[in-house]
Structure formats: structure tokens, C-alpha cells
Amino acid sequence: MKHSIAILLLIGLVSVGCRNKGCTDPLSPDFDAKAIKDNGSCTYDGRLIIWFDELSSDNMENLWINSLSVYVDGSLVGTIAVDEWTNGQPNCSNGGGVRATVNTDGADSKLVQYTVQDDLGFTIQQGTVTVSNSNCAWVEVVY
């Protein structure tokens, strides 16, 4: 009988211990407040926001450009109509522009390449930008 109780207690402790594994880093979007032991599941994301102002919008519209496509590291992350300009740099959490989530692969930051093309496929602007985890980076398209 004593052995049965000891075995049941041991099983209970093991099962509770298994449930307390997860991401223990509060800077990660995968953070689990109940986790006691880190299991390597933390990821780190930053945001890249590509935006333009009214003057650039007017200049593009005058040349019959209707929309822009934004690529980050060669992948399309969004399109935006040229009349969707913002008055100044957009807010990190909401607002205008094309927004891309960048996984920094556990590093503090990641250097990414961006390309902005018009609706005919011509490159309007391209470059590299450093995106930090849990932060925003902005690129203004000037046309």
C-alpha cells in the first residue's frame, strides 16, 4: 500500500513537471508565464513598416502608379495603394504602410533586404534595414 501511494505521488510530480516547460523569456511573443523550465520554444519577432507620405503619393499618382508591392528577403509581404499615404511615420502597433513580421531567429536583430516595386514591376526603392526583436523599424519610400 505504501508503495502504491509513493508511485502515485511520483507520477503526479512528473506530470506536473512536464506541464511547466515552455518559453520563459518575457521578450518573446511565445512567453508562457506558467513555464518554469525553458524548452527552447521562444521565437523573436520584430516589425518592419514600409510607408510613404502625401508628396510621394502625389508624385506616383502623377506617373500613373496605382499600387506598390513590398518584398522582404525576396518574399512578398504586402501591397498598398498609392493613395494610402500617411502623414508622418506610422505608429508601431497600428496605422498605415505595409507591415512585415521579421523573425530574428533568437538574435537581438536581423539585417533584411527590402524591395518596393510599382504595379508594373519596376523597382521604386530597395535597400537593407536592421530589424530588432520586439521592436519596429521603419522605411520611408521617397518618390
Q: What feature does the model see in each segment?
A:
Residues 30-32, 49-52, 100-101, 143:
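Extracellular/mature segments of secreted proteins
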Residues 4, 29-32, 77-78, 121-124:
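Short, intrinsically disordered, charge-biased short linear motifs at domain edges
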Residues 115-143:
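Structured interaction patches on ligand/partner-binding surfaces of diverse proteins
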Residues 60-68:
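Short coil-to-beta strand junction motifs in C2/discoidin
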Residues 71-106:
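Tryptophan-paired
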Residues 51-61:
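Short amphipathic, basic-aromatic surface patches that mediate peripheral association
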Residues 103-119:
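A short tyrosine-centered beta-strand micro-motif
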Residues 2-3, 12-49:
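Bacterial Sec-dependent N-terminal signal peptides
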